[in-house]
Amino acid sequence: MAKSMKKAAARSRRAGAARKRRATPRMKTSKRAAGKIDPLLAPVKGAERRNIGHVQLEVGRAGEARVKRMIYPAGFRWSTDMKPAVGTDLCMHAHVGFLARGEIHIEYADGCVVEHKAPQIVAIEPGHDGWVVGNEPVVIIEFDFEGDTVRRTGMPTAHRH
């Protein structure tokens, strides 16, 4: 009787180990996977791609909205890199989306400072300067309605406390 109990206990342990293996599959890595491009930085299928002020911008349409992936390089600052191309002292766009990677510092004309660190949903009001914090590029997935973003998203037209 003791032998049959030992056999039953051994079968139970093996069955439990098999269930555990099925519940937590091992990740398989291959040499090919190791050289893959990071999906946050890979080209977006079907998007229009352009660079402006050192920012890599990819834009696609989703109904009436545009979906944009913006990659800001380490060292980027709006007032240095974009101001000459845009011609305004501050960024006058509203930004609504998801900060997928990196950290950004936002400063408004009234001196108010906001910092965002990934992963985070962001809503940045018009009238700001901003820059990348640290040595990692910033990746933002943004939704906009071209010149109608503020109204369509319910954002204020200027920074408020």
Regions found by a protein language model. Name each.
Residues A2-I71, F76-T80, M155-H161:
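A short, N-terminal "cap"/entry segment at the start of jelly-roll beta-barrel domains
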Residues M70-Y72, G97, V122:
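Conserved GNAT-family N-acetyltransferase fold
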Residues R77-C91:
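Catalytic core of non-heme Fe(II) oxygenases with the double-stranded beta-helix
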Residues T88-I106:
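Short, conserved beta-strand element in jelly-roll/cupin
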Residues E125-V150:
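Ligand-binding loop in jelly-roll beta-barrel domains
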